[in-house]
């Protein structure tokens, strides 16, 4: 084994659990999709490591690679779907409690990405903006939108009044 392989193995072991956890949240808990995203993230990261400028933490850069891989897959999936067959899906709900994970999974992609990165993983708006290629104001407004949608989903009685 070469030094490069050892270094990669060390990085892989250090960052894969966090990437997988993020991928799970971004895919609404779809384990197979999350595994595919993480694998493609590592493939892409090894090809594009020269674009890592060291201006942010390596994990932040890897998270942005993962998010970009997911966005590309989402765009590709939309191109393959016939528009007339698309129907909005209501998140499943049981009578006793609304599952927070399901509520997060039901958020629109952009709002969910920012909510998860900010409120779950603790990234600040500047880092999120860099990862997603948006301005900080977009990150802030999408976070407010996500929180509002979650409040409505988790407290439907309050949303009606």
PLM-predicted stretches and their roles:
Residues 7, 18, 102, 112-113:
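Pre-recognition alpha-helix immediately N-terminal to the DNA-recognition helix
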Residues 16, 20, 42, 108, ...:
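C-terminal flanking helix
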Residues 1, 10, 99-108:
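Short amphipathic alpha-helical boundary/capping segments
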Residues 47-54, 63-84, 93, 156:
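Arg/Lys-rich amphipathic alpha helix in sigma70-family domain 2
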Residues 1, 19, 23, 34-45, ...:
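Short, small-hydrophobic-rich alpha-helical interface motif
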Residues 2-10, 21-40, 53, 136, ...:
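Short, charged helix-capping/linker segments at alpha-helix termini
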Residues 114-118:
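A short pre-motif secondary-structure segment
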Residues 67, 71, 132-158:
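DNA-recognition helix of helix-turn-helix
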